[in-house]
């Protein structure tokens, strides 16, 4: 009587599932370790500002409208709020830009006049105009997804650049370059 031997699977066939599983685990781990970008760039870059006319958010400055950007000079539009910690951190940098001749307009998001007045008194007021966007309608229309965000607007009212997050001191030269590009 012969002992029928069952056919053996090749040795690699035993290790293949384990190898594939380990490769999967490594790829998933690397994907989880990579920081996710939560930045949502505006689709409005290269487009004219949407029409808006915001009331004054502060007694110290006039409101803000689309027509204010058709001056022939590039401007920085800063989306901020008194309740935003990074906005307070950004304030000295905006003041530095204003001292260097940059015209800065602000849109205060979901803010209250007394809170905003206190914020500006504490952190300085680099803004030529501040519009009150109490329901974030203009913020969303220009493609902003959070605060702070800044946009370089050319002298015709076209959005040329979006900066997501607070502007840091080391980014000032880049912002100045973007403003200069927008003025050409």
PLM feature spans:
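N-terminal targeting signals for export/organelle localization
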Residues: 1-55, 184
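Hydrophobic alpha-helical transmembrane segments of integral membrane proteins
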Residues: 10-14, 88-89, 144
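A short beta-strand-turn-helix
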Residues: 52-76
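Hydrophobic beta-strand anchors of alpha/beta hydrolase catalytic cores
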Residues: 76-77, 104, 150
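Aromatic-flanked redox-active Cys/Sec active sites in thiol-based oxidoreductases
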Residues: 78-83
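Structural microenvironment flanking redox-active thiols in thiol-disulfide oxidoreductases
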Residues: 88-124, 134-140
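Thiol/disulfide oxidoreductase modules built on the thioredoxin-like
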Residues: 121-126, 133-184
């Amino acid at each position: 009587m012969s002992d029928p031997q069952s056919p053996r699977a090749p040795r690699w066939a035993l290790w293949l599932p384990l190898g594939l599983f380990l490769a999967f685990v490594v790829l998933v781990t690397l994907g989880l370790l990579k920081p996710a970008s939560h930045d949502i760039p505006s689709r409005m870059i290269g487009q004219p500002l949407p029409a808006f006319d915001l009331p004054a958010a502060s007694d110290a400055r006039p409101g803000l409208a689309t027509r204010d950007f058709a001056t022939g000079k590039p401007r920085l539009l800063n989306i901020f709020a008194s309740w935003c910690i990074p906005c307070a951190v950004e304030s000295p940098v905006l003041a530095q830009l204003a001292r260097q001749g940059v015209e800065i307009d602000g849109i205060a998001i979901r803010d209250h006049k007394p809170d905003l007045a206190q914020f500006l008194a504490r952190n300085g007021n680099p803004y030529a105009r501040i519009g009150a966007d109490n329901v974030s309608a203009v913020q969303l229309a220009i493609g902003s997804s959070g605060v702070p965000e800044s946009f370089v607007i050319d002298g015709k009212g076209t959005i040329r650049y979006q900066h997501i997050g607070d502007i840091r001191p080391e980014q000032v030269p880049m912002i100045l370059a973007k403003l200069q590009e927008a003025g050409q």
